[in-house]
Amino acid sequence: MPPKASKKDAAPAERPILGRFSSHLKIGIVGLPNVGKSTFFNIVTKLSIPAENFPFCTIDPNEARVYVPDERFDWLCQLYKPKSEVSAYLEINDIAGLVRGAHAGEGLGNAFLSHIRAVDGIFHVLRAFEDKEVTHIDDSVDPVRDLETIGEELRLKDIEFVQNKIDDLEKSMKRSNDKQLKLEHELCEKVKAHLEDGKDVRFGDWKSADIEILNTFQLLTAKPVVYLVNMSEKDYQRKKNKFLPKIHAWVQEHGGETIIPFSCAFERLLADMPPDEAAKYCAENQIASVIPKIIKTGFAAIHLIYFFTAGPDEVKCWQIRRQTKAPQAAGTIHTDFERGFICAEVMKFDDLKELGSESAVKAAGKYRQEGKTYVVQDGDIIFFKFNVSGGGKK
């Protein structure tokens, strides 16, 4: 019996997302000097996927690719017992510390800001610990001041970019009556006013057409942020930190993005222990590493999801950006799959787990056949059918 055709071929249309439309997105670690960025990156690097798993990629010393933990993936591997298991991963870039005046080229300013432009989201590491042995660039620990310093530098660089864009558009408008130039000019003026009002681009009320234009700019304040509050091991264990309430209040007033308290000192201690010893230490102290949560939160923040292909040969996560349609998702496996796309046969993970087998999912009428307009959902288990000249089906 053929799979049941879906009555609803597409999910309700969402507003376009700010950012690059790609399955190869990455997140950068940002912060002032001596806040724990490099320590955090070194901890993550210990968990990174060996370079031989990416034979056609050069991984720079300031890049790490780490597995995204997922109980669904683990369950599928238990069910199918495949010859090959391929998890999703998050690419994390370590970015040099920023100083006040970076937008004007102070310190490593220009390099720093160009590196942020090259990533798709930000892990903003904040120092919330006092240590006389670790100097602070401003001679005192004040994470809210640090938040404002970095926020202002990014906004000032965006204002500079938008002003240059306005100047270029005005020159072009003298030579052409193209309506698109006028639309872009009007948008740039709105964006500049928004930034000069102390607001980041990602919190603007932009129309779909605006977002399409903004995505060509790769503005720094358009990128999603996850705040990582680095506290002492003692504060982390007792779940109390004097700086945290003020950080929460500031973030709530400025967009309300995710805050994750953690401790580089504690995570480094765990990373240096054998796994069984680390597990025992966590159990005895009723505490756990927050690195898996940080990885999963960062992955979701840059709008990445993944679908599964599953069978006895391989269980694999295929990462795509949210709002990706079935043919483009098929193209992440092979370009022929997109070119000759016929349909996607889709199971929901929860249905498979509840019913126990593909045959049971089919018998329950929950094995769906989706067309070209279907928007792939996180955790879909998909079997693509395609046909190209001289080709076949998967």
Curated annotation (Swiss-Prot):
Cofactor: Mg(2+)
Positions with a binding annotation for Mg(2+): S38, T58
Record InterPro entries: ATPase_YchF/OLA1, Beta-grasp_dom_sf, G_OBG, GTP-bd, P-loop_NTPase, TGS, TGS-like, TGS-like_dom_sf
Gene3D superfamilies according to UniProt: 3.10.20.30, P-loop containing nucleotide triphosphate hydrolases, TGS-like domain
Main location: membrane
Keywords on record: ATP-binding, Cell membrane, Cytoplasm, GTP-binding, Hydrolase, Magnesium, Membrane, Metal-binding, Nucleotide-binding
Control of this protein's activity: Activated by GAP1.
Family membership: Belongs to the TRAFAC class OBG-HflX-like GTPase superfamily. OBG GTPase family. YchF/OLA1 subfamily.
Domains: entry comment: The C-terminal domain is involved in RNA binding.
Protein name: Obg-like ATPase 1
Organism: Oryza sativa subsp. japonica (Rice)
